[in-house]
């Protein structure tokens, strides 16, 4: 939704106590700007921000590029501060984007729990999220940003691949 969910005084505790315990952090551009304490306007800025975030103790950082303009959206995976790969996706014209960040990180976690490597887990999670966004793009639920359709293909959630 774009709303800040953490109070300012909690940020230091998050950075010093929780972030070093994480295997993967999945900030969007505004969140990465806060964590890296720098403005992000291009790919070079993303690289510098990811290096700064990794220095805080997190091995993997997936900076999500959904806030950049354009028809194609690119997410960047860094391992130990170095660009490992990028993931390209399309922009979907919808107001139903509430929870996309949480859905992506939860899907990645579920694929990691199924013993997939980080790259495969992220790729599979992005495929799942894209399907959920497309399946829910025209739903009308409540006011403002609506949710993605998490149950667009339930069989895929329960079968081992």
Give the role of each language-model region.
Residues 83-85, 111-125:
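Phosphate-handling active-site elements
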Residues 31, 66-69, 90-93, 126-129:
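Glycine-rich beta-alpha junction loops
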Residues 119-161:
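Charged C-terminal helix
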């Amino acid at each position: 939704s774009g709303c800040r969910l953490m109070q300012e005084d909690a940020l230091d505790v998050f950075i010093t106590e929780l972030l070093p315990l994480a295997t993967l952090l999945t900030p969007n551009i505004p969140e990465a700007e806060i964590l890296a304490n720098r403005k992000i306007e291009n790919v070079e800025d993303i690289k510098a921000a990811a290096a700064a975030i990794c220095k805080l103790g997190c091995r993997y950082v997936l900076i999500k590029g959904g806030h950049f303009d354009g028809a194609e959206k690119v997410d960047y995976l860094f391992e130990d501060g170095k660009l490992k790969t990028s993931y390209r996706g399309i922009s979907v014209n919808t107001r139903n984007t509430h929870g996309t960040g949480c859905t992506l990180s939860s899907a990645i976690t579920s694929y990691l729990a199924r013993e997939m490597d980080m790259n495969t887990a992220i790729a599979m999670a992005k495929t799942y999220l894209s399907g959920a966004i497309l399946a829910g793009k025209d739903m009308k639920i409540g006011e403002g940003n609506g949710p993605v359709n998490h149950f667009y293909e339930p069989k895929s959630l329960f079968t081992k691949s």
